[in-house]
Amino acid sequence: PHAALSSQSRGRQTEEAPCSVRTCYQRDRDRIIHSKSFRRLKYKTQVLLLPEGDHYRTRLTHTLEVSQIARTISRALLLNEDLTEAIALGHDLGHTPFGHMGEKVLDSLAKEHGLGGFHHAAQSLRVVDHLEKDGKGLNLTWEVRMGIIQHSKGQVDVRSGFGLAEPSTLEAWVVRISDSVAYLNHDLDDALRAGIVSDPDIPESVIKKMGASHAQRINSLIMDIIENSEESRPTFSPSMLASIETLRGFLYGSVYRHANAQIEDSRVEHVLAALFRYRVEKCKDDPQ
């Protein structure tokens, strides 16, 4: 009863004739999949910024994992799976190269040059609204656009027009929580593969609550969401939230702040700063 219905969508910025075989959310999903920005996600790394190997996550594989997790939860909760999928596939279209370190560097540089800052959720909306299709944008529905801008808990540029509001649909809530399920698990999996940590390092309380394998942990988190979600929003149980905080603390202490990660962070800062300042100078010479 709380699913967002395509027939009740608030529509698009530019009105279009309906499609005879696809709902408006299905069309949004397809437009995102066929966009250039979606294809570019395969070149953007996650935690390991310069990985050596074929099996580490990229922003594209992360997006696909979020989509799968979100669709499963949405289906179980009788929500609109098409809307959920569209939001999930579009949520990181504006993310930077080099993971969140890249976002941090660009945010600092943008503020330094009086541009207000940078947030990947706001940039994702800018991508679908203004950058795709040679500036025409994808003309997505209001619900998908809102889900994209509100998928993150971080500070969102108020110039996006959406401020810091919480997700406006349950489907958007599902994507937000699925994003956490995906990154917590694949960041740990990538760290194990890279030898940054080993299985005995994982906190015992996390193994006891979530499971010993990657598949078990994802399944435990998904089932916990399905079994504990309220009518107002999808959520975790208190005991699972405590375990998530333990895992997040472990990742920050042992993976994100690992010595090799710190070295890569300094390289990222140097590269992005040089590229940013080059573009600023080019804009001064040629405002067009």
Regions found by a protein language model. Give the residues of each.
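Short active-site segment of divalent metal-dependent hydrolases/proteases
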Residues: 90, 94-98, 182
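Histidine-centered, transition-metal-coordinating active-site segments
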Residues: 1-63, 67-73, 80-81, 102, ...
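Short coil/turn residues that cap or connect secondary-structure elements
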Residues: 33, 78, 94-97
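Active-site alpha-helix of zinc metalloproteases
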Residues: 86-87
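A glycine- and small-aliphatic-rich helix-loop capping segment at beta-alpha/alpha-beta transitions
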Residues: 99-112
